[in-house]
Amino acid sequence: MSFEQAMKELETVVGQLERGDVALDQSIALYERGAALKKRCEDELKRAEEKVAAITLDSNGQPTGTKPVEGL
């Protein structure tokens, strides 16, 4: 499942829970599914953030390479 698919399903789950028109057992199942989807999306975002890099420049402003972006 892609990040986008997981987010879309998570939005659907949240919408169902917010409406409050589902039985308790179904609400619990939806909550558990939502928690799993949230974790999956957070993990995917963390992996993506770790891949982000800043371009380093020399004293003349020329690119010399990349380094990880701190604070992400």
From Swiss-Prot:
<comment type="similarity">
    <text>Belongs to the XseB family.</text>
</comment>
<dbReference type="GO" id="GO:0005829">
    <property type="term" value="C:cytosol"/>
</dbReference>
<dbReference type="InterPro" id="IPR037004">
    <property type="entry name" value="Exonuc_VII_ssu_sf"/>
</dbReference>
<dbReference type="Pfam" id="PF02609">
    <property type="entry name" value="Exonuc_VII_S"/>
</dbReference>
<keyword id="KW-0378">Hydrolase</keyword>
<dbReference type="GO" id="GO:0009318">
    <property type="term" value="C:exodeoxyribonuclease VII complex"/>
</dbReference>
<dbReference type="GO" id="GO:0008855">
    <property type="term" value="F:exodeoxyribonuclease VII activity"/>
</dbReference>
<keyword id="KW-0963">Cytoplasm</keyword>
<keyword id="KW-0269">Exonuclease</keyword>
<dbReference type="GO" id="GO:0006308">
    <property type="term" value="P:DNA catabolic process"/>
</dbReference>
<protein>
    <recommendedName>
        <fullName>Exodeoxyribonuclease 7 small subunit</fullName>
        <ecNumber>3.1.11.6</ecNumber>
    </recommendedName>
</protein>
<comment type="subunit">
    <text>Heterooligomer composed of large and small subunits.</text>
</comment>
<dbReference type="InterPro" id="IPR003761">
    <property type="entry name" value="Exonuc_VII_S"/>
</dbReference>
<comment type="function">
    <text>Bidirectionally degrades single-stranded DNA into large acid-insoluble oligonucleotides, which are then degraded further into small acid-soluble oligonucleotides.</text>
</comment>
<keyword id="KW-0540">Nuclease</keyword>
